[in-house]
Design a protein with these regions (language model features):
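A glycine-rich (often HGG/GG-containing) alpha/beta subdomain
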Residues: 1-148, 154
Length: 156
């Protein structure tokens, strides 16, 4: 594992995952999150942004995810950019906020995973990267995991 110019450890791969629940009729918006050195390049490759929107950290951009042919618009999206080290994982993180329908999410996620240098995240891997990069301690990671896996609010 190498370090960036800012001293943040750099893991060699970029991970992606759907960060919101996706089920028929359960949500209007879904979030696909990427973290790692290729996050920006992947999203820039599959997305077109009208006008002259600046790609700045902690800003939202409006655009469309394009099919592999570069012409068909798969979905209208908002893209949130969080550059290292000012993100949950302390890596470059880019979120694609797309429509929440199952088909739309599958199509956008498939485009993300088609790109070289990106793979599907393992369960808990975003938190693992946050721990490895000093953004989260193990106690807080365990509490987050517990809250995410409880079936009801009554058990909190």
């Amino acid at each position: 594992m190498s370090s960036s110019a800012r001293g943040v450890p750099v893991l060699p791969d970029t991970i992606a995952a759907v960060a919101t629940a996706v089920a028929p009729g359960q949500g209007g918006i879904a979030v696909i999150r990427l973290s790692g050195p290729m996050a920006q390049r992947v999203v820039r490759t599959i997305t077109v942004f009208p006008g002259s929107q600046e790609w700045l950290s902690h800003r939202v951009l409006y655009g469309h995810v394009l099919a592999a042919d570069g012409h068909e618009r798969l979905d209208e999206v908002l893209v949130l950019v969080m550059l290292a080290p000012r993100s949950f994982t302390a890596e470059d993180v880019v979120e694609i906020h797309c429509h929440g329908g199952v088909i739309a999410v599958q199509r956008v996620m498939a485009r993300v995973l088609e790109q070289p240098g990106v793979r599907r995240a393992l369960p808990g891997e975003f938190s693992q990267r946050a721990v490895l990069n000093g953004r989260l301690d193990l106690t807080r990671a365990a509490v987050s995991y517990t809250h995410l896996t409880l079936p009801t609010n009554r058990e909190v």
